[in-house]
Every structure is written in structure tokens, then in C-alpha cells.
């Protein structure tokens, strides 16, 4: 409904958002537009975000911070007394295969085949087809371990149990979670808690 006329969009909001979820009023159109661009062209927006807001020094600082916390977690596991030896060995093995993903992908989505025009509905169809083709081309191929769960401007962190990856996009690597100019204790207490939380999922 969001790609159709204002009447459809309004009716959709009245029922699905206001009646079913108790949301009193619809967000401004420009904000919904930003959300749509972020959802549809996330990595294109992400490249701009990284260029403007996430310098290489920030990534290097986070790389070191994550490594230190994984090392500390390993030390705790090695000295753990409530696990039996076999369980501890498996936990250490799993920790040794952790893949931290920090800041942004190393393999950006190529949008060059995507045609965007002036019509919202046509653009929605083109984006849906682009996303479908992107998924279909992966059929029968090995899992792409470089693919990220969300674009770098996302304020979130996650653990992927299928790939044993912890992900910290550039969007969360800003105050109050992370500040490259702050005392290390501040970062260990802020983003460090998030990192520890994600490591703990593993």
C-alpha cells in the first residue's frame, strides 16, 4: 500500500498501524521516504555514510578492542572450573573460529544494473526484482561469508550462529557506544558491554 495512492496508503495505516498496533499517527512522508531508501539501497547509502563518518582509525581501534575482549573471554574459558574438559575444549574451539565483522562490508552490492526512475511504484518493482535476482544468483553456490546482515549505517550488533560471526556496523560505533577520542575505559564500558554480549551468544 505504501507504493500506491494516498488513499490506499492512508487506509493501510488506519487499519494495520492505528487499529492493530495502536500507533496514533503516521510518520511524516519524508521520514518514510528515508526509511524506504535505507531499506532498498542500504549499501549505496552505507558507502556514503562510511566515507563521511567512519574513518579507518575508528575501524582499527574497534579491531583492537574486539581482539582484546575475545582474548579476555578465552582466558576466562581456560580458567573455567564449572565446565568439564571436553566442553571447555569445544567452547575454546568455537571461540577460535569467531569472525568479527566491524564497520562495513568488504564486498559492496553492485547496483549498476538497477534502473531508478521518477515513478515510485515502478521503482518498487525494480527494487523487488533486483533483490530477487541477487538471491537467485546465490543458488547452488557456497555460502557467501562476506555478506552482511544489514548496511553499515544500522545502529545494531548481532551474532550469527550459522556462520559464527559477530557484527558491529559503523552506525553503532559512535557516541554513546564508541568514541575514538575517549579514555579506553569508557569504550570498554560502553561498546565493550555490547561486544561481550554478542560474544556470549556464541
Locate predicted features:
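Functionally constrained cores in energy, signaling, and assembly domains
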Residues: 33, 47, 51, 58, ...
Amino acid at each position: 500500500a505504501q507504493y500506491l495512492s494516498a488513499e490506499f496508503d492512508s487506509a493501510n495505516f488506519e487499519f494495520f498501524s492505528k487499529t492493530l498496533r495502536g500507533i496514533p499517527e503516521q510518520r511524516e512522508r519524508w521520514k518514510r521516504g528515508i526509511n524506504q531508501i535505507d531499506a532498498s539501497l542500504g549499501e549505496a547509502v552505507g558507502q556514503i555514510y562510511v566515507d563521511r563518518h567512519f574513518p579507518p582509525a575508528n575501524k582499527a581501534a574497534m579491531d583492537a578492542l574486539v581482539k582484546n575482549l575475545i582474548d579476555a573471554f578465552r582466558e576466562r574459558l581456560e580458567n573455567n572450573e564449572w565446565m568439564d574438559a571436553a566442553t571447555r575444549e569445544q567452547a575454546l574451539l568455537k571461540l577460535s573460529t569467531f569472525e568479527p565483522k566491524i564497520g562495513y562490508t568488504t564486498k559492496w552490492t553492485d547496483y549498476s544494473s538497477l534502473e531508478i526512475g521518477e515513478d515510485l511504484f515502478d521503482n518498487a518493482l525494480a527494487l523487488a526484482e533486483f533483490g530477487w535476482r541477487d538471491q537467485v544468483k546465490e543458488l547452488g553456490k557456497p555460502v557467501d561469508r562476506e555478506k552482511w546482515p544489514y548496511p553499515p549505517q544500522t545502529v545494531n550488533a548481532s551474532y550469527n550462529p550459522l556462520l559464527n560471526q559477530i557484527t558491529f556496523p559503523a552506525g553503532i560505533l559512535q557516541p554513546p557506544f564508541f568514541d575514538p577520542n575517549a579514555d579506553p575505559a569508557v569504550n570498554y564500558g560502553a561498546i565493550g558491554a555490547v561486544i561481550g554480549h554478542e560474544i556470549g551468544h556464541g
